C-alpha cells in the first residue's frame, strides 16, 4: 500500500520555482518512488539526520521524512539542501 504524501509550505514554494520539466520529475518521483518505497532515498546526516533525499538534478534534491506509524511521507524541501 502506498504511503500518503504531504507537502509542506516550504516544499510547495520550492516546487513552484522549478521549471515545468522538473515539476513533472518531482511528481513522477513522488508517485513512483517515494510513495511506494520511501526508504530507497539517501539517508541524510547532520542537521537533516532522520530525513532522506532523492536527486532532481545536479543541484536540487527532494528532502523528506517518513512517519512509519501513520504511513505518511512529509516532503520538506524540493531544492538544494547544501545551504545555497
Regions found by a protein language model. Give the residues of each.
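Enriched for short, Lys/Arg-rich terminal
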Residues: 2-13, 17, 21-24, 39, ...
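A short, surface-exposed loop/turn module that caps and links secondary-structure elements
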Residues: 31-56
Amino acid at each position: 500500500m502506498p504511503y500518503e504524501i504531504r507537502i509542506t509550505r516550504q516544499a510547495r514554494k520550492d516546487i513552484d520555482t522549478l521549471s515545468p520539466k522538473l515539476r513533472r520529475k518531482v511528481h513522477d518521483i513522488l508517485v513512483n518512488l517515494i510513495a511506494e518505497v520511501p526508504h530507497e532515498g539517501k539517508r541524510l546526516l547532520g542537521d537533516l539526520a532522520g530525513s532522506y533525499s532523492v536527486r532532481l538534478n545536479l543541484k536540487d534534491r527532494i528532502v523528506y521524512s517518513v512517519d512509519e506509524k501513520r504511513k505518511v511521507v512529509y516532503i520538506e524541501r524540493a531544492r538544494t539542501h547544501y545551504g545555497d
